[in-house]
Curated annotation (Swiss-Prot):
InterPro entries: DUF520 (IPR007551), UPF0234-like_C (IPR035571), UPF0234_N (IPR035570), YajQ-like_sf (IPR036183)
UniProt function note: Nucleotide-binding protein.
Protein name: Nucleotide-binding protein BCG9842_B4128
CDD domains attached to this UniProt entry: YajQ_like
Record Pfam families: DUF520
Amino acid sequence: MAKDSSFDIVSKVELPEVTNAINIALKEIQNRYDFKGSKSDIKLEKEVLVLTSDDEFKLDQVKDVLISKLVKRNVPIKNLDYGKVEAATGNTVRQRATLQQGIDKDNAKKINNIIKEMKLKVKTQVQDDQVRVTAKSRDDLQAVIAAVRSADLPIDVQFINYR
């Protein structure tokens, strides 16, 4: 019974699901009447989404279609970091959205502070792009999971390797 229980807090985006959502969004854009004759497109370049359209209004519509498809495929949209709208070739506008993979140092500190404020007997350890939480009591780990889920973090977090 002296064995410690642990879990990892991670922030991941499943790239195959993102690709599927992009394909479905592109089909909808091709079939929608308000996009007929427009140069709207969505591309995935490594971990950056590139949205292109005729003007900012249509770009916002492309973004709305993409977000709806990402939500349906359970891809966390909190992990999308949108850049500025910029002019592209051929009278089009472009916007880049970076997929944030992993927990950066600032968010790891926020998670660490949330856990420390609970004053439970748990240990936290920041490992590269994840946070490991260890405790003797599984009830304490469940309380930590509930607290981190209810916290308003700028990224979406998942809990894996619960042992």
